[in-house]
A protein has these predicted regions:
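Alpha-helical transmembrane segments of multi-pass small-molecule/ion transporters
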Residues: 1-285
């Protein structure tokens, strides 16, 4: 089991880097920046992710009277947005990939400055090093994305050849990562039963989906992407802060459990959206 746990960081690295490279090879800089010109949509995305979700997490914690450590884990996820898995969810759901990438980058950059400012207000004793968060997100996500975009712009033939390989690597590493997380954390998930932690994860995910959908504007694609993007939190940033700041292991366990619960719900929803679109050409979200 210890060996499997050690394989998770390496598998995560392969998944994130290969996914970001493949995304860059599939898009142009103009396609990524275009959705961000819609100032109203950008403001609504920031409202959903950095106002509604942090205070939503805080409210769920109080409503369910969670153990303090479990509540801290939930609030950590509420303040951490910009997940590398969002573009993959958008691909599965067959929705607007360019907006998904643009939203991911926007939320990730804001998270770097947002968490150190807001967490001490919501959690007593919390302190966050923005440099450590920024370093991991820039090196693992922004840099590979930039390399892919540059290669797409300068070497289109090579980019077209490399992208299918990276797509396969990304898909296989995602499957492996999901299995590893569940196998190595199964006992931790069981320990959460009876604490209302799993219920909190379900409520948190449903709240995020609803907030993103309602604030996503008139376009069906933007509503779907913002719903998925608001519900899929930045697990890496939440784990980084949880491990460095809090001594109680239940904080990290709660982050993992809520992330796993949310991932299952979002994968099912994304697959349903894709199947519905394939059958009718219309997505019901």
């Amino acid at each position: 089991m210890e060996l499997l746990s050690k394989a998770i960081p390496a598998t995560t690295f392969v998944f994130v880097v290969s996914s970001m490279l493949a995304l860059g090879l599939n898009l142009t800089v103009g396609q990524v920046l275009a959705p961000l010109r819609n100032i109203k949509l950008v403001c609504l995305a920031l409202l959903a992710n950095f106002v509604l979700m942090p205070f939503g997490a805080f409210g769920i914690e109080k409503l369910l009277r969670l153990d303090q450590s479990l509540g801290v884990g939930l609030v950590l996820l509420g303040t951490a947005a910009g997940a590398p898995f969002l573009p993959k969810l958008a691909q599965i759901a067959k929705t607007d990939l360019a907006f998904a990438v643009a939203l991911m980058v926007l939320l990730m950059i804001v998270t770097i400055g947002y968490m150190p400012l807001v967490l001490p207000l919501l959690i007593e004793g919390a302190s966050v090093d923005p440099v450590k968060i920024a370093r991991s997100l820039v090196l693992l996500m922004l840099l590979p994305l930039a390399v892919g975009l540059a290669m797409k712009a300068s070497y289109q033939v090579a980019a077209a050849r490399v992208k299918p390989v990276l797509d396969r690597v990304s898909n296989l590493s995602l499957i492996l990562l999901t299995v590893l997380i569940w196998v190595t954390n199964f006992d931790k998930v069981l320990a959460i039963f009876g604490t209302r932690g799993i219920l909190a994860g379900v409520l948190f995910t449903v709240l995020a989906l609803g907030a993103g959908h309602l604030l996503g504007g008139p376009s069906g694609d933007s509503r779907r992407v913002l719903a998925l993007g608001t519900a899929q939190r930045n697990i890496a940033a939440a784990l980084l802060v949880g491990e460095q700041t809090f001594s109680d292991p239940k904080v990290v366990v709660m982050v993992i459990v809520v992330a796993d619960v949310g991932l299952i719900i979002l994968l099912l929803i994304a697959r349903r959206l894709a199947n519905q679109k394939q059958r009718t050409g219309v997505i019901p979200l």
